[in-house]
Structure formats: structure tokens, C-alpha cells
């Protein structure tokens, strides 16, 4: 199933988005299509075995009145958008300079005499407004005709019909002395709407300009991430010389020199030197991080104080930074479930508005005697124009994507990678937070506090334990292996090692069975440990104990303790403030779990949970009605992360974490978990607020423009006010989304 991104130009509102999606989805072999209005981007997915012909897609889009090209250079498109915004800004200035005198001429200026039997005041207003109509409004008119000729309707159609109607009526009034065939309603004493037409174009153009600038600001975050990418790297040749080459040409395993002040070009491992690294742009971590030999570094970070040599571990398109950008890009193409309703409404929005405008206009023309100084025909024209221009499909089209772009972008700047709209939606609804103890509440690096020998010496116990644990990546295994290496590098070469999930490891050597693990494993193997449990009672309440056996004989045990993360207590407190129930999962005994839960303020825990039991526990919570966010390391907790409503992998840049989790956090900080859920709630709050505003605006604005208050209050919405309201509605949506830029994560 192939996927392709294309750029679509010429879209102005939600109706355009609906049109493009309809055009492409109706093509043979298309499985799905998603269109993002602010990004001018469409993601197309073909069905299995379909002919993936980009030319057919582009032809169909072109016939629909839009432009398209393969999406390859977002920085170039951003530059073009900036240039378009600048051109639009010039049009706004010229338009307003001409519109303001037009307004005064039609509303306040008295008789200025005549020129060739024409009212000079109205003639000047005609000339000024015509310049605005043809110069500043050209894109609206072109867009409208492209839409009409392709059999669709959009915002441009509404603006074009409204302004053209006002200009034609007013022009007939100005030139009525030369147009004897016109009915008396077009006499030179009739009202003109040059100011309305000019204000409509000026206000909507001003709104579009503000909107364009705001959309550029909304994408700042993801483009700042793109700017982190190094273009070249200094590779170390076999003879020790250094060559500068494009990062695209650097292979895995290549030694790279990174000097002070330079950006690390690719992910890698330090093979020589040590330095302080600025990771602020990748993770939001303000303090420099010290790294030395064998430590991993991420591409996009900056070396601050000393040159280092790294060995690259990833290609340029597979680094953590590249994955971050791809994740953000994918997330920004998502649609909230409510957006499907918006899309259905948008598909019929413009035709319905035109029908309402015509119906209201005809009603006032034939069933009223006018209003104030306006006769029934003039009133009908005002109602028609006002209804057409106040309707705003733009606000509907921008409500979701602008908030999504800003929310996911600002999250990425702080190392909070939200993979899609579903993760945001579920984080908004989350009411239960499930935390794995090891590596989440604790640092995940336990240290040995004591080795107790029963039927062997300590060194022998440690050697057997390290030899068995050599087959495991569990934090306990790493601690035992590291402790053994400090005394000896000798390991027992077992014939076979078996991993017993949630219990421990069993090794076989010359028909002899060795085991390391918890009490249930020992009991399963017939090793008597119950006699020592009372002796270990105090230890078990604060430490993890692993037993070591040979056959049915207990050799001894190893006591280990893992430190709590510095921010654990604060994070739990913040989670409770958000109204979340916090639950701890651990494979430890209940005594240890109880001690830790009391220490961090967690009221509910589940102890002695096997790895496969984590997913079952999450399912159990969901069956009780909980919306569950599961936090783990993305490796040992993959099943639970996948089952949870929101799976959060903490401190992980691994491929497994990126696959398993809905949200990936680059920092090892539990506060980021709470920050991400808070960001999800804030972003979804903006989306819902935007959609509510867009719907309420149209539901109130359109009836007002149709004149529902004329009979009861005598109040009529002038076309210029309608245009201002329309422009303001979409601008409000974008600027409301932009307030997310000020969001900050929790920090200790």
C-alpha cells in the first residue's frame, strides 16, 4: 500500500478541502486521502496492488480548479507562502487607502457637482472601488470562476457574487442618466454600495493576510526542528585526515569529528573525547548534558566546549531528529473525529448559503416595503450581499488543523512527540494513569546493596547470576553484570538459557540446572526459600531480592535497590491535580510495592505483575470504564502500550518505542508525562473551542444578515460589517490556536 504527499494550491476554505478529498477519493485505486488546509498538503494512500499514478491524481485535481505538485521541499513552500503574504499585505494597504475615501464619498460627502451629467461624487467612488474590485479582489474572482467552471463552490464564490452584485447595482445607479432602458429603481438618487463592495474585499483580504501570517507562525516549531539538521559532517578518513561531506553520503559506522559549536550531524556513539551537549532544541532540556566515551548522542544537538569523535549509528533519514520531524508531520495531517462532521457540512455549506441569501433577498424584495431610506429592491440587495459575505467556511476549515499544528509543534520543541490526533483526543479524555515502576517511577538503574550466601561464596553467586543474566536486557541484569565485571570478566558458558516471563532465568549446564529469579520461580523449581522470607521481611519492603539456586539448593540471594526519579513525587502530585487516578504496576512483591507507593503518594498499585499481565491489567481497567494512559519504556511494555488508550514511551528514542507508543518522550522525566497529557487537553480544548466558535458564528451571523431582526428591532447588518465579521471569524480561530505557542511544560 503506497503513500504519497502532494502540495495542493488554490484552497481557501473547508469547502475546498472537501472538494479535493472528494475528487481524489473518487479515483480508482485510492484507499484514503487527507488534506490539510494550512499546510496546503494532501496525503494519498493507494489500495493494495493499485496503479500508483501521480499524473492521474494531478490531472483530476487540476480539473477541479486547483494546482498540485509532489510535496518535496516544505522550506521552499514556506518561502513562497511568505512571499504571497507580503504581496497580500501590499494589496491590503492599497485597498484600504482606496476604500476609506470611497466610504466617506458614499456616506458623508455632499454634492460635488456633475461631470457629463453624472454625479461626480458617485463617479469618483465608482473609480476608486473599481480599482479595489479588480486589483485587490482579483484572486477572489479568479478563484470563484475556477470553482464555478469545475462545478464546485467555495468562499471565493460567496465573495465574488456578493461584491459583483453590489458593484453592478451601484454602477447602474451611477450611469443611469445614459441608460434609459433601466427601470426607475436605478435612478441617480438610489443608494449605492461601492463602499460595501470595497470594504468586503478590503476586510476579507486583511483577514486573509492576518491568517496567512498566523499560519506561518503556527508552523514555526516544525521548521525550527528542520533547521537543526546539519547539512554536512566532518568524516575521519583512514589516514587520519578529515573531509567535509554531505550528511546524505555518511554511512553507518563512519567516524565523525564534531568540533566546538558544531551540530552533531547524525546519531552516534562517542568513541573519543567528552563534552557538554546542548539538547535544548531537541528535548527542551535547558541545562547542558555531559557526555563521554560510549555515551550516545543525537543528531541536531550542539557540542559546547570540547571536540568529540563519534561513530554514526543511523543514516540521515533514520535519526531521532528525522523520526521526530516525520512524527510531527504525520500528526499534523490528522483529523479529529468531529472534523468528519465538519467535512460533511463544508461540502454543502456554500450552496446552502447561496440558496439562503437568494431566498431572503427575494422575500424582502417582494414581501416588504423596504426599510428606512432603502426601498425593497435596495434592501434585497443589502440582504443578499451581507448573507453571502458573512458566511465563513474558512473558520470551519482552520479550526482543527491550526490547533493541531501548533500543539504538536510546541510539544516537539520540548521533546514531547505526539503521533496523531487520536492520541490527543484520548489524552484529553484520560482519567487513569498507569505507571510501570522500574524505569518510570525509578531511574531504572538498580544497584546491588548486599549479596547473601547460603551454600556458596559471594563471588560464585555473582558469577552464576551474571552468566545467567547475560541473556537479558532487564535493568536488574545490567546491574548484576556491571557488578560482576568490577571483579572478574569470567562467565559460565551455559548450554542453554531459558527466560521464564515475570519470574527470572534458568540455565542448563551438563545436566545441572541453575536459576535466578523471584520466590515463585524458586518454588516452581522446588527450591525452599520460605524459611528465609521472615528474615528478609524488612529488606523486601524497600528492596528487590533475586534468589540464585543450583538444582534444588538455594545458593543465596542478591539485594538490590533502585532510586526514585527526582521528579517522581512532583509528577504524581501534578497528575492528581489534573484529576487523574494514578496506579503503579510492578513485578515486585506487595511489600516493596506498598513501601514505594506510600513514598510517592500513590494510593493504588498492582504487585507481582508479569510482563504479559500488564496488558491484561490495562484491559481490565478499560472494561471498568477507565480511559487509560500507560507509561513504560517502550520495549518491555510494548503490549501494554499498544492496548492502552494512550501509550506513552518515556525517555526513548528507540525504534520499538516509536512503533509501540502513541506518544514518545525524549527526556527521562516523569513530569513530561503529565505535561504531555496537559498539552493534549489544552490542544483539544482549542480545537473544540475553535469549532464551537465557527459553528456559533455562522449559526448567528447568517440569520442576522438575512434580516431576522429587521421587523422586530429595525436593525439591519450592513455588507461592510458582514465582511468585517467574516474576516474576524477566521482570524480569531487562528489566533486562538496560536495562544498554544505560549504553553510551557512542567519543570522541577
Specify the residue positions occupied by each region the protein language model found.
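Transmembrane helix-loop-helix hairpins at the membrane interface
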Residues: 87-232, 344, 351, 451, ...
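P-type ATPase nucleotide-binding
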Residues: 448, 452-580, 590, 602-618
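Membrane-embedded alpha-helical bundles of multi-pass transporters
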Residues: 112-117, 149, 168, 410, ...
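Conserved ATP-binding TGD loop and adjacent catalytic N/P-domain core of P-type ATPases
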Residues: 1-2, 18, 509-511, 544, ...
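Soluble-to-membrane junctions at the N-terminal ends of transmembrane alpha-helices
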Residues: 77-97, 123, 143-166, 325-358, ...
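Conserved cytosolic catalytic loops of P-type ATPases
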Residues: 28-47, 55-59, 191-192, 223-318, ...
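Flexible metal-binding regulatory segments at protein termini and peripheral loops
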Residues: 1-122, 134, 241-242, 322, ...
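Juxtamembrane coupling segments of multi-pass membrane pumps/enzymes
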Residues: 198-260, 291, 418, 592, ...
Amino acid at each position: 500500500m503506497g503513500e504519497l504527499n502532494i502540495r495542493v494550491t488554490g484552497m481557501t476554505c473547508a469547502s475546498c478541502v472537501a472538494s479535493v478529498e472528494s475528487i481524489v477519493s473518487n479515483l480508482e485505486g485510492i484507499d484514503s486521502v487527507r488534506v490539510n488546509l494550512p499546510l496546503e498538503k494532501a496525503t494519498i494512500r493507494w489500495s493494495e496492488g493499485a496503479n500508483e499514478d501521480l499524473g492521474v491524481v494531478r490531472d483530476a485535481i487540476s480539473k477541479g480548479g486547483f494546482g498540485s505538485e509532489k510535496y518535496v521541499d516544505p522550506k521552499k513552500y514556506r518561502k513562497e507562502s511568505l512571499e504571497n503574504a507580503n504581496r497580500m499585505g501590499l494589496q491590503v494597504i492599497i485597498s484600504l487607502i482606496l476604500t476609506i475615501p470611497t466610504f466617506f464619498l458614499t456616506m458623508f460627502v455632499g454634492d460635488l457637482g456633475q461631470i457629463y451629467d453624472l454625479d461626480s461624487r458617485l463617479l469618483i467612488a465608482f473609480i476608486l472601488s473599481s480599482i479595489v474590485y479588480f486589483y485587490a479582489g482579483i484572486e477572489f474572482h479568479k478563484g470563484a470562476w475556477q470553482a464555478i467552471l469545475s462545478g464546485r463552490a467555495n468562499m471565493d464564490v460567496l465573495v465574488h457574487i456578493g461584491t459583483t452584485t453590489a458593484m453592478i447595482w451601484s454602477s447602474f445607479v451611477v450611469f443611469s442618466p445614459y441608460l434609459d432602458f433601466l427601470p426607475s429603481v436605478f435612478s441617480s438618487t438610489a443608494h449605492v454600495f461601492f463602499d460595501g463592495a470595497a470594504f468586503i474585499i478590503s476586510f476579507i483580504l486583511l483577514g486573509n493576510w492576518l491568517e496567512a501570517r498566523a499560519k506561518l507562525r503556527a508552523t514555526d516549531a516544525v521548521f525550527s526542528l528542520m533547521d537543526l539538521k546539519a547539512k554536512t559532517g566532518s568524516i575521519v578518513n583512514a589516514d587520519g585526515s578529515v573531509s567535509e561531506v554531505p550528511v546524505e553520503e555518511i554511512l553507518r559506522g563512519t567516524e565523525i569529528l564534531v568540533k566546538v559549536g558544531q551540530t552533531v550531524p547524525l546519531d552516534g556513539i562517542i568513541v573519543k573525547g567528552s563534552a557538554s551537549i546542548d539538547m535544548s532544541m531537541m528535548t527542551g532540556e535547558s541545562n547542558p548534558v555531559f557526555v563521554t566515551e560510549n555515551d550516545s548522542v543525537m543528531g541536531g544537538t550542539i557540542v559546547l566546549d570540547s571536540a568529540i569523535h563519534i561513530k554514526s549509528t543511523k543514516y540521515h533519514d533514520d535519526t531521532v531528529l528525522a523520526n521526530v520531524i516525520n512524527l510531527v508531520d504525520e500528526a499534523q495531517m490528522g483529523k479529529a473525529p468531529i472534523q468528519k462532521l465538519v467535512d460533511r457540512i463544508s461540502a454543502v455549506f456554500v450552496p446552502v448559503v447561496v440558496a439562503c441569501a437568494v431566498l431572503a433577498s427575494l422575500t424582502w424584495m417582494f414581501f416588504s416595503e423596504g426599510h428606512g431610506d432603502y426601498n425593497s429592491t435596495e434592501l434585497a440587495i443589502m440582504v443578499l450581499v451581507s448573507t453571502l459575505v458573512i458566511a465563513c467556511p474558512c473558520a470551519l476549515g482552520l479550526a482543527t488543523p491550526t490547533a493541531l499544528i501548533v500543539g504538536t509543534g510546541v510539544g516537539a520543541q520540548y521533546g514531547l512527540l505526539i503521533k496523531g490526533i487520536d492520541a490527543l483526543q484520548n489524552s484529553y479524555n484520560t482519567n487513569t494513569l498507569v505507571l510501570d515502576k522500574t524505569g518510570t517511577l525509578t531511574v531504572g538503574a538498580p544497584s546491588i546493596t548486599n549479596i547473601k550466601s547460603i551454600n556458596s561464596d559471594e563471588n560464585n553467586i555473582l558469577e552464576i547470576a551474571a552468566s545467567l543474566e547475560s541473556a537479558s536486557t532487564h535493568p536488574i541484569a545490567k546491574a548484576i553484570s556491571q557488578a560482576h565485571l568490577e571483579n572478574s570478566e569470567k562467565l559460565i558458558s551455559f548450554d542453554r538459557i531459558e527466560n521464564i516471563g515475570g519470574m527470572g532465568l534458568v540455565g542448563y549446564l551438563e545436566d545441572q540446572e541453575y536459576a535466578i529469579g523471584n520466590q515463585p520461580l524458586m518454588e516452581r523449581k522446588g527450591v525452599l526459600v520460605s524459611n528465609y522470607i521472615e528474615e528478609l521481611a524488612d529488606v523486601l519492603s524497600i528492596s528487590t531480592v533475586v534468589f540464585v539456586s543450583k538444582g534444588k539448593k538455594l545458593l543465596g540471594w542478591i539485594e538490590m535497590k533502585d532510586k526514585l526519579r527526582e521528579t517522581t513525587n512532583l509528577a504524581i502530585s501534578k497528575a492528581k491535580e489534573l484529576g487523574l487516578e494514578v496506579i503503579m504496576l510492578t513485578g515486585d512483591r506487595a511489600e516493596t510495592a506498598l513501601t514505594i507507593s506510600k513514598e510517592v503518594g500513590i494510593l493504588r498499585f498492582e504487585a507481582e505483575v508479569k510482563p504479559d499481565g500488564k496488558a491484561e491489567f490495562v484491559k481490565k481497567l478499560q472494561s471498568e470504564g477507565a480511559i487509560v494512559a500507560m507509561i513504560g519504556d517502550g520495549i518491555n511494555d510494548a503490549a501494554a502500550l499498544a492496548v492502552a488508550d494512550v501509550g506513552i514511551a518515556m525517555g526513548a528514542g528507540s525504534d520499538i518505542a516509536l512503533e509501540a507508543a502513541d506518544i514518545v518522550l525524549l527526556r527521562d522525566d516523569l513530569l513530561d508525562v503529565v505535561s504531555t497529557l496537559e498539552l493534549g487537553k489544552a490542544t483539544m480544548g482549542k480545537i473544540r473551542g475553535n469549532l464551537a466558535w465557527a459553528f456559533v458564528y455562522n449559526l448567528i451571523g447568517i440569520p442576522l444578515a438575512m434580516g431576522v431582526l429587521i421587523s422586530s428591532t429595525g436593525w439591519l447588518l450592513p455588507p461592510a460589517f458582514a465582511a468585517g465579521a467574516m474576516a474576524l471569524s477566521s482570524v480569531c480561530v487562528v489566533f486562538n490556536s496560536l495562544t498554544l505557542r505560549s504553553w510551557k511544560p512542567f519543570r522541577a
